[in-house]
Amino acid sequence: MRHALRLAILLTIAVTAPAFAADEPPPAEVSKPSRLDNLFDRLKRERNEKAAERIAGNIWAEWMKSGSASIDLMMQWSNKASEEKKYDVALDFLDQIVTLQPDYPEGWNRRATVHFMMENYAKSMADIEHTLRLEPRHFGALTGMAAILKETGRKEVALDAYERALAVYPMMREAQSEVSTLADELAGQGI
């Protein structure tokens, strides 16, 4: 049941994040890395949870922009297949995406998410690690990593991954809750 709840949270973040971006238009004529840097700076400083969610949504919207109409279309198809629980179909699209555009972090992250949904944790972790090599601030990948580590009984390392996510996105409620829970559990074990 907890696995299903975590999966629902991850899917909700991934699918609805672009909707938050609609609230706040991006600055005109700024490069994608500059936009992301500015958004991450704002996200780290923001102390209002709802405002932070909007900024995170803008970051997700930037991550979704591959720079290729074909890749963007395949991402949409893979998302639709995932929503319909057609994970093999989603993986087919995502395999093509990471082959055609290996420097696109969100392609790797989405493939990691599908592997997670299929409980292929080793493959998911490999894709998460690739995502984080390309975008070390990817709070979605960090929380995905933490969820897998927690699920597989590696609570200390999971706590570290959640703390890394909070260093990027301090107002992320899910990560705050998990840090509190894991810290309490580990304190009870006498780490």
Regions found by a protein language model. Give the residues of each.
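N-terminal leader/linker segments that initiate helical-solenoid repeat arrays
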Residues: 2, 19-72
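Residue-level signature for tetratricopeptide repeat
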Residues: 42-45, 80, 114, 148, ...
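TPR/TPR-like (Sel1-like) alpha-helical repeat modules
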Residues: 43-45, 153-174, 180-184
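Conserved structural position within tetratricopeptide repeats
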Residues: 61-64, 98-99, 130-133, 166-167, ...
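Alpha-helical adaptor scaffolds
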Residues: 68-140
